[in-house]
Amino acid sequence: MPIPIKEGPSVKAATRIVQTAVLALMLFAAAIRPGHATPATDVEKYLAGLATWSADFTQTIDDGHGKVLRSAAGRFYLERPGKFRWDYVEPSEQLVLADGKQIWFYDKDLEQANVRDMDSTLASTPASLLSGGGSVSTQFDIKALPPAGGLQWFQLIPKRADTDFQLVRIGFDKGELASMFLADKLGEVTQLTFTHSSRNAKFPADLFSFTPPPGVDVIGRNPK
């Protein structure tokens, strides 16, 4: 984004991006088969067939009035159940990685890493659906929106009041995830654009593991 990791709220913001992107992947089926059953039904059917997903991404965060606050780019990887990785390459090298138990936030330039328990960080969030933590329809109100900009759009509003975001809008291009907008309760809007995606490809065994390099300051509970 870039993802500053010195303070808790910044880590929380990075986690929120991960949570909503995971949910976006689960809406492929609704975009592939518009008008078939309901969006929630299609999402749950699709989960059985989703093993891995990856894509290049660009990300911007604005103040809700069009003023860009931060921008970044990199590649995103997902492997069910419960693993994901954000490799930020612009404007600096940073990493957000979940190995199924912990989530790591690593900033190469700052030589700093923050590690958190995955269950407590992602509980009752979109990402909890990765490990079967509830159905889409019980956690979100989902509706199809009119096509716009050549994309098929869906809107998700959380049913719980204690979430960090107000709504998510997700756009698909011929069944492939292409764009996502997230409005949080602070008024900021995050936009993610995905390109060069790959579904159910085999990843290297060590893609979702992280060991802090020598000299890196580790904040939080180190699983080692």
Model feature map: region roles:
Residues 5-22:
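Bacterial N-terminal signal peptides that target proteins for export
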Residues 58-62, 87-89, 106-108, 157-159, ...:
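A generic structural motif
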Residues 2, 28, 33-69, 212-224:
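N-terminal leader/targeting segments and the immediate start of mature chains
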Residues 75-124, 190-191:
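An acidic-aromatic
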Residues 55-57, 71-73, 86, 165, ...:
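Extended beta-sheet lipid-handling architectures
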Residues 114, 138-141, 145-224:
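Gly/Pro-enriched, hydrophobic low-complexity segments
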Residues 68-75, 187:
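Amphipathic hydrophobic-ligand
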Residues 47, 122-137:
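Short, solvent-exposed helix-to-loop capping segments enriched in aromatics
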